[in-house]
């Protein structure tokens, strides 16, 4: 295998290792070459990435190498972050997410009782966006899945913990409980 192919493979390894990065020893095992040679290749690649024609750089932190964007392009990355995405959540998904956030762990049936409508699609969307996940199973008939929020939920909404959620006013909480009660009452009377 020539140097160009080694660099190409290392580039891919850096990419798939993501923010965690990769140790030179791991690269050496994958490529079946000596660790010193890996270091030499990484240093060459770092120099190649230093040019103005490259958007990425290879950085080393605590013996781990990873890709990073260049600081001089930060204003462009910020513009991308500021552009609203087409993948924003629907009103139904936001309502379901709020219910999960405040009432977790919670089953799909409990969510549907609160909302008064099916939540299947909203749940699928929230799981696919990694905002909620299965937290286990409830005791009882059928052992339904319990849902809760994820670390990504906290990151997305700029929260450190669930305690940072805005408090529900007592009026809203009583209204939700009243809605739940009347919704259940209507089901029984049918």
Curated annotation (Swiss-Prot):
Keywords: Cell cycle, Cell division, Chromosome partition, Cytoplasm. Its main location: cytoplasm. It is found in: Cytoplasm. The keyword Nucleotide-binding does not apply. One of its GO terms (cellular component) is cytoplasm. One of its GO terms (biological process) is cell division. PANTHER family: SEGREGATION AND CONDENSATION PROTEIN B (PTHR34298:SF2). Homodimer. Homodimerization may be required to stabilize the binding of ScpA to the Smc head domains. Component of a cohesin-like complex composed of ScpA, ScpB and the Smc homodimer, in which ScpA and ScpB bind to the head domain of Smc. The presence of the three proteins is required for the association of the complex with DNA. Belongs to the ScpB family. Participates in chromosomal partition during cell division. May act via the formation of a condensin-like complex containing Smc and ScpA that pull DNA away from mid-cell into both cell halves. This is Segregation and condensation protein B. It comes from Bacillus cereus (strain ZK / E33L).
């Amino acid at each position: 295998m020539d140097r160009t192919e080694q660099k190409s493979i290392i580039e891919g390894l850096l990419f798939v290792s993501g923010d965690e990065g990769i140790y030179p020893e791991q690269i050496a095992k994958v490529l079946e070459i000596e660790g010193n040679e890996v270091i030499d290749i990484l240093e060459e690649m770092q120099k190649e990435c230093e040019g103005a024609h490259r958007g990425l750089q290879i950085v080393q932190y605590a013996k781990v190498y990873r890709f990073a964007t260049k600081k001089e392009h930060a204003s462009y990355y910020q513009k991308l972050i500021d552009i609203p995405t087409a993948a924003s959540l629907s009103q139904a998904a936001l309502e379901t997410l709020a219910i999960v956030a405040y009432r977790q762990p919670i089953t799909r049936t409990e969510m549907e009782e609160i909302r008064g409508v099916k939540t299947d699609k909203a749940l699928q969307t929230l799981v696919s966006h990694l905002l909620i996940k299965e937290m286990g199973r409830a005791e009882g008939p059928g052992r339904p899945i319990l849902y809760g929020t994820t670390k990504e939920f906290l990151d997305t909404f700029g929260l450190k913990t669930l305690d940072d959620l805005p408090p529900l006013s007592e009026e809203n909480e009583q209204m939700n409980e009243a809605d739940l009660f009347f919704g259940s009452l209507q089901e029984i009377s049918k």
